A protein has these predicted regions:
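Conserved N-terminal subdomain of the carbohydrate kinase-like
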Residues: 2-20, 36-123, 275-278, 287
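Acidic-glycine-rich active-site phosphate/pyrophosphate-binding loop
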Residues: 5-15, 31, 194-211
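Charged C-terminal helix
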Residues: 15, 63-66, 243-290
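Short pre-catalytic strand/loop immediately N-terminal to key active-site residues, enriched for Gly-Thr
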Residues: 16-17, 21-27, 207-222
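Short, small-residue alpha-helix embedded
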Residues: 38, 155-156, 218-242
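Phosphate-handling active-site elements
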Residues: 42-47, 206-207, 235-249
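Conserved phosphate/ATP/ADP-binding segment of small-molecule kinases
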Residues: 130-206
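Short, well-structured alpha-helical segments that form the helix of a local strand-helix-strand
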Residues: 168-176, 210, 241-257
Length: 290
């Protein structure tokens, strides 16, 4: 029996799309790889512009090869020209030249922009050149909708030492005021053994989001910052409001850590893995408004 060849046209259902501008992580735990995995897990189509190729695994960075700034800009333009992007996130931008070209591409674009100011890897390798910090602060952060620094990054941006929750609150407010943007200061690097608390400051909203701190195998926390900022961009692309998107992003990271999978060859080594039920972890977040 022959199958009939029917010439039919189907209008595909629209899906939200996000763009990540970041470095490639050969180990798969962070960078572009983590971003695209996070987009997909949350029902968002992912596009990308690669800024650098890193040779790394969850425990060490062996090498960083930055792309030419023009090559990064061309990737961004190619995506924005024809694809209906709903939100953008940036990660590792590495050099002043790349930062300036990315800023030129994004200035005309009126979309939610999540900036993860990546400076140092989990293993301690510098992922931003010294002269790039000034370009980040002068040319790029003014474009951000959200900035998502960890504690060491927030100390550099705010010019403050963070040793307590009140220090974190002061730093978040200072960053938000300086760049007129939302700030989520991530508390994963804090010294507390019990809780991981993030400070959220945006348009008069000030609160903390706290969860019990998980004690996990080596390598598991690699890529948490990338995953958080990508999840935030994904939920913004889907139209969630600010607080809903932030809470969902934190829940996604918590779930990814709690449901980590073993990937090591000859040692205990684990990596984050997207959670099956996000709502399970949203219920574990304590929200304190101030």
């Amino acid at each position: 029996m022959e199958l009939q060849n029917r010439n039919t046209t189907r209008n595909p259902e629209r899906i939200p799309v996000a763009l990540t501008i970041a470095g490639s992580d050969s180990g798969g735990g962070a960078g572009i790889q983590a971003d695209l995995r996070t987009f997909s897990a949350n029902g968002v189509f992912g596009t990308s512009a690669i800024t650098a190729v890193t040779s790394q695994n969850p425990t060490a960075v062996a090498r960083v090869d930055a792309l030419p700034p023009d090559a990064v800009a061309e990737q961004i333009r190619s995506v924005l020209d024809v694809i209906d992007i709903r939100a953008i996130k940036t990660g590792m931008l590495f050099s002043a030249g790349i930062i300036q070209r990315v800023a030129e591409c994004l200035k005309p674009v009126k979309l939610p922009l999540v900036v993860d100011p990546v400076m140092i890897s989990t293993s301690g390798t510098k992922l931003m050149q010294d002269e790039a910090l000034e370009a980040m602060m002068s040319d790029f952060l003014p474009l951000a909708t959200w900035i998502t620094p960890n504690i060491p990054e927030a100390e550099l941006l705010a010019g403050l030492t963070i040793r307590s929750s009140s220090d974190a609150a002061a730093a978040a407010e200072k960053i938000a005021d300086r760049w007129q943007t939302g700030v989520i200061l991530k508390g994963g690097h804090a010294e507390s053994d019990r809780m991981a608390a993030d400070v959220v400051c945006s348009d008069g909203m000030f609160c903390t989001l706290a969860t019990a701190r998980l004690h996990l195998p080596p390598g598991t926390s690699h890529g948490t910052g990338c995953t958080f900022s990508a999840a935030l961009a994904a939920f913004l692309a889907k139209g969630e409001n600010a607080l809903q998107a932030v809470v969902a992003a934190k829940a996604f990271v918590l779930g990814s850590l709690a449901e980590a999978r073993a990937i090591g060859k000859d040692r205990v080594l684990a990596a984050m893995f997207p959670p099956e039920k996000l709502e399970t972890y949203q219920k574990q977040i304590l929200i304190s408004r101030q």
